[in-house]
Amino acid sequence: MAETRTIARPYAEAVFKLAKNQNDLARWADTLQLAAAVAADENVRSLIGNPKISSRKLGELFLSVCGNRLNEEGRNFILLLAENGRLEILPEVNELYEQLKTRHEGVLDAKVISAFAMSDAQLKDLVTDLEAKFKRKIEAKVSVDADLIGGVIVEIGDEVLDASVRGKLEAMAVALKS
């Protein structure tokens, strides 16, 4: 995984630089998201790993799956990756590009783990509070973990805010053992 990310990083940075210069970050995000989804497909992955298929043919097959949803630059990028035998890194290129894009836009990614499904109003209130605390726009991805018993855990970068019942109980257990 680390090796794949190392290989994917220069591609993601090059696409990001191009997108930024063209003031077209959103279109490139869509292009990479589509290409990553195609590359992650089980059937496509089996083609990518097939040594009997030439890189040119593989690039053409990949583009045919994408259909007409890619512009000329997106198509050229796919063909470049195919020629270099790098189509399998598209999911990582997409992920790294998204990180560069959100950093450029001043957006922080927040991973919110809740004991129960959150309503839209609850999530909006939480995001508003987090934006006030961090003084940046927050993009939240929510998951549910019933083991928390109640409350939420918020992970932003290397900071963890644990407001869960499980976290409080664990802290009490540590305090009682001391």
From Swiss-Prot:
Gene Ontology MF annotations: proton-transporting ATP synthase activity, rotational mechanism
Secretion signal: which residues?
Answer: none
Quick one: a GO cellular component term? proton-transporting ATP synthase complex
Q: How does it sit in the membrane?
A: Peripheral membrane protein
What is the top-level taxon of the source organism?
Bacteria
Q: Give the UniProt subcellular location, in the record's own words.
A: Cell inner membrane
Task: Provide the alphabetized UniProt keywords.
Answer: ATP synthesis, Cell inner membrane, Cell membrane, CF(1), Hydrogen ion transport, Ion transport, Membrane, Transport
Q: Which family does it belong to?
A: Belongs to the ATPase delta chain family.
Kindly give the NCBIfam families that the UniProt entry links to this protein.
ATP_synt_delta, PRK05758.2-2
Q: What does this protein do?
A: F(1)F(0) ATP synthase produces ATP from ADP in the presence of a proton or sodium gradient. F-type ATPases consist of two structural domains, F(1) containing the extramembraneous catalytic core and F(0) containing the membrane proton channel, linked together by a central stalk and a peripheral stalk. During catalysis, ATP synthesis in the catalytic domain of F(1) is coupled via a rotary mechanism of the central stalk subunits to proton translocation.
Subunit and interaction comment: F-type ATPases have 2 components, F(1) - the catalytic core - and F(0) - the membrane proton channel. F(1) has five subunits: alpha(3), beta(3), gamma(1), delta(1), epsilon(1). F(0) has three main subunits: a(1), b(2) and c(10-14). The alpha and beta chains form an alternating ring which encloses part of the gamma chain. F(1) is attached to F(0) by a central stalk formed by the gamma and epsilon chains, while a peripheral stalk is formed by the delta and b chains.
What is the official name of this protein in its record? ATP synthase subunit delta
Species this chain originates from: Nitrosospira multiformis (strain ATCC 25196 / NCIMB 11849 / C 71)
Species classification: Bacteria, Pseudomonadati, Pseudomonadota, Betaproteobacteria, Nitrosomonadales
Its gene name is: atpH
